[in-house]
Amino acid sequence: IASCLVGSEMCIRDSMKKIGLVALFALLLAGCDDGGEKKAQENLRKAEAALEKENFNEAKLQIDSIRILYPKAFEARKQGVKLMQQVDLKEQQKSLIYLDSMMVVRQAQLDSVKGNFVLEKDTAYQEVGNYFYPTQTVEKNIGRSFLRGQVNEQGEMSLTSIYCAGGTLHHTAVKVSVGDTFAETPASKDSYETTDLGRAIEKADYKMGEDGGVIAFIVANKDKNIQLQFIGDRTYKTAMQPNDRKAIAELTELARILSGMEQIRKDKKEANLKIEFVTRKMQEQEEEK
C-alpha cells in the first residue's frame, strides 16, 4: 500500500509540473501576442505604397485585410480607418479630374452637331427643352402622318407617331418593317386624340427603351425603304420618308452625346458629395484630438 501511495504522489507531482509548464507557456504566449499589430503594420505599409501609385483598389484591399485577419490589432485598425479616408479622398479627386476631361470631349461633340437641330424651349413653363430635326418641326408637317423623333436636353429620346390621314384609328402602337424583318412598339402609355378644322389627329409617344426596338431598327435600316404601320382599331400603312429616317438616326447620336453629359454631371455630383463627407469626417477627427 505504501508503495502505491508513493507512486501516486509522484504522479501528482509530475502532473503539477506539466500543468505549471503549460501555464507558463501560455503566459509567455500572452506576453508575446500583440494582436497581430506587427503583421497588420505590414499591410498598412503596402496600402500606403499602393496609394502613392494611385492603385486605390489595392490600397483598400490591404486595409480591409487588417480588419479581417487581425481584428485585435486595434492600433493598426485605427490607422487603417484614417488611411482609408485618404484613399477615398484621392480617388474621388482623381475621378473629378477624369470627369472634367470627359465633359470637355462631350461638349466638343455637342458643339459640332447641335447646329443640325432645332431646340424648342419655352422658358416660361419648360425647364428642359427638346431638340427636333429641322424637317420634322410641326409647322413643316401639318396634315402629314409620320414618325417624329425628339431628344430633350438631358438626352432622353422618344418617338411620336402622328396620324391624320382621315378617319380615326385610335392607334396606340406602330410597326416598322423591311421585307420580313420588323420591330413593333408596345402599346403607348401616352396617346391622345384631337381635331383640327374637323380633321382627326392622333398622337402616341414611345420612350427609347420602351419602344420595342423601333428606334434601333430605323437606325440599322436608315438607308433602306422602311414601311411604317399605325396599329389601332384598324391599321394604316405608309412609307417612311428618307428625311424621317435620317432625322431619327441623327437624333439617336445626339441622345448619346447628351445622355453622356448628363451622366457625367450626376457622377460629378456624387464625387463632390463623397469628398464633402470624407473631408468633414477627417475634420471631426482632428477636432477630437
Tell where the protein language model's regions lie, with residue ranges.
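Internal interaction segment
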Residues: R199-D205, D223-K289
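Short, charge-rich amphipathic alpha-helical segments embedded
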Residues: G36, K60-Q92
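Single conserved hydrophobic/aromatic residue that forms the stacking wall/gate
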Residues: I1-D14
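C-terminal motif of bacterial Sec signal peptides marking the signal peptidase cleavage site
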Residues: L28-G31
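Hydrophobic/aromatic side-chain positions at a characteristic register within alpha-helices
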Residues: L44-E52
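Alpha-helical linker/edge segments of TPR/alpha-solenoid repeat scaffolds
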Residues: M84-K114, Y125
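Bacterial lipoprotein signal-peptidase II cleavage site
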Residues: D33-K39
